[in-house]
C-alpha cells in the first residue's frame, strides 16, 4: 500500500470512529507531514482521497474539515415486479441514446466513460504511439483464440486485486466487456432460455439478451444490498432459469456495492439450483475503497461464475480490450468466440 493510501486509511479510520466529529478541523497538511514523516504532496494526496470519499472537505485558507452531517433523502423502495419472464423491448429508447452525436462541451451522462481529455492519459497515448511506430507485420495478424499471452498474464495479475486467483490460461481476451457478456450468455444459454437480471439493469446487457433471443426475468434490486436473494430464490423455484446476470460492484445504474456476505449467499444459491452466474465487473475498479471490492468469482470454487471485465471504464473505451474468466464453460466460450 502506498504512503498516501496508508495515511488516508489511518485518518479515515479516526474520522469514522468519531475521534473527529462533523465540523471539526483536521490537522494541517504541514502538521500531518511532520507527524508521519512524509512529504507535503503525500499528505495532499491523502486528503484528496478522503475528499473523494466524503470524509473531508477543504475550506479556502482554513484547511480541511470533517463535513457536517447531511440529511440523506430516503432511498427508493424496491419495485413490485411481475415474476414472469418477458421479452425485452427497449430498441427505440436505446437507439435514441446511442444515436446522439457526442458534443465536446456536454458531459455525456447517458454513457459511463472516463474523461479521455484528462492529462493522466498522456502516458497511455505516448505508449500507444511508441508501439505503433515499432510494430511490424505480426501486429496485423490474428492472435490465438485466447488472445495475447502477455496481455492475459497482465490481466491475471490485475485480477488479484479483486481476490480472484486466476492464471493466464484461465483468461480469454475479448473486444470489450460487451462481447464478453454476449459470449457468456451464448455459452450457457440457448435462444428462448430465461436469464434472471437485476431490475433496474444496464440497457446494454438487456440488448445483448434480446439480440440473442433470451427472455429476462426481472428480480427486484435495492441500492444498498443489491439483488433480492429472497425474490431470486422464489424465481429459481418457479422457473427454469439458466443464468443469473449481475453487476455486484459499483452497479450501473444503482451504484451499490453488494456486501461480501451477500455475494457468498448469491453464489450458494446458484450452486443449490445449479445455475451459472454471469458477473459484469467493468466498474469494479472505480470503488473508493482499498482494497477494491472482491468479485463473486473470487469465492467461486466450482467454476460456475463467468467473470467479465474491460479497460473501458478505467482507461478509455476506444481501446476495446475486454476479458473473461469463464471457468467450467471455457470450452463452450472458445467455441462461441
Question: Where do the language-model regions lie?
Answer:
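N-terminal basic, amphipathic alpha-helical segments
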Residues: 1-130, 333-337
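Residue-level detector of conserved, well-ordered beta-strand and adjacent loop positions
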Residues: 67, 110, 220, 297, ...
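Short, solvent-exposed loop/turn segments at secondary-structure junctions
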Residues: 112-116, 178, 202, 249-251, ...
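A general structural signal for well-ordered alpha-helical segments in protein cores
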Residues: 121, 151-152, 330
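Conserved core of the PLP fold type I
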Residues: 133-273, 284-302
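Short, Asp-centered acidic motifs that coordinate Mg2+ and/or phosphate
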Residues: 241-243, 275-276, 306, 321
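Glycine-centered flexible beta-alpha turn that most often forms the glycine-rich phosphate-binding loop
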Residues: 280
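Conserved core segment of the aminotransferase class I/II
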Residues: 301-337
Amino acid at each position: 500500500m502506498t504512503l498516501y493510501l496508508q495515511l488516508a486509511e489511518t485518518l479515515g479510520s479516526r474520522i469514522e470512529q468519531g475521534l473527529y466529529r462533523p465540523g471539526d478541523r483536521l490537522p494541517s497538511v504541514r502538521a500531518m507531514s511532520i507527524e508521519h514523516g512524509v512529504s507535503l504532496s503525500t499528505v495532499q494526496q491523502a486528503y484528496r482521497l478522503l475528499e473523494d470519499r466524503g470524509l473531508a472537505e477543504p475550506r479556502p485558507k482554513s484547511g480541511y474539515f470533517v463535513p457536517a452531517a447531511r440529511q440523506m433523502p430516503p432511498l427508493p423502495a424496491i419495485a413490485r415486479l411481475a415474476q414472469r419472464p418477458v421479452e425485452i423491448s427497449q430498441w427505440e429508447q436505446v437507439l435514441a441514446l446511442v444515436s446522439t452525436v457526442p458534443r465536446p462541451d456536454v458531459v455525456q451522462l447517458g454513457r459511463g466513460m472516463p474523461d479521455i481529455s484528462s492529462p493522466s492519459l498522456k502516458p497511455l497515448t505516448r505508449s500507444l504511439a511508441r508501439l505503433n511506430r515499432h510494430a511490424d507485420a505480426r501486429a496485423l495478424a490474428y492472435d490465438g483464440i485466447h488472445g495475447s499471452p502477455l496481455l492475459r498474464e497482465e490481466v491475471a495479475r490485475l485480477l488479484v486485486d479483486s481476490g480472484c486467483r486466476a492464471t493466464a490460461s484461465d483468461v480469454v481476451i475479448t473486444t470489450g466487456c460487451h462481447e464478453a457478456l454476449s459470449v457468456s450468455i451464448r455459452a450457457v444459454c440457448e435462444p428462448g432460455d430465461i436469464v434472471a437480471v437485476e431490475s433496474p439493469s444496464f440497457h446494454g446487457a438487456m440488448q445483448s439478451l434480446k439480440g440473442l433471443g433470451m427472455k429476462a426475468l426481472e428480480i427486484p434490486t435495492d441500492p444498498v444490498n443489491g439483488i433480492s436473494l429472497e425474490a431470486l430464490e422464489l424465481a429459481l423455484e418457479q422457473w427454469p432459469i439458466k443464468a443469473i446476470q449481475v453487476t455486484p460492484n459499483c452497479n450501473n445504474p444503482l451504484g451499490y456495492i453488494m456486501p461480501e456476505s451477500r455475494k457468498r449467499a448469491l453464489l450458494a444459491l446458484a450452486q443449490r439450483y445449479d445455475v451459472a452466474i454471469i458477473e459484469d465487473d467493468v466498474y469494479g475498479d472505480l470503488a473508493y475503497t482499498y482494497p477494491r471490492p472482491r468479485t463473486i468469482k473470487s469465492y467461486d470454487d466450482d467454476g460456475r461464475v463467468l467473470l467479465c471485465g474491460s479497460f473501458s471504464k478505467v482507461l478509455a473505451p476506444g481501446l476495446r480490450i475486454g476479458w473473461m474468466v469463464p471457468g467450467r464453460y471455457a470450452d463452450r466460450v472458445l467455441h462461441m468466440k
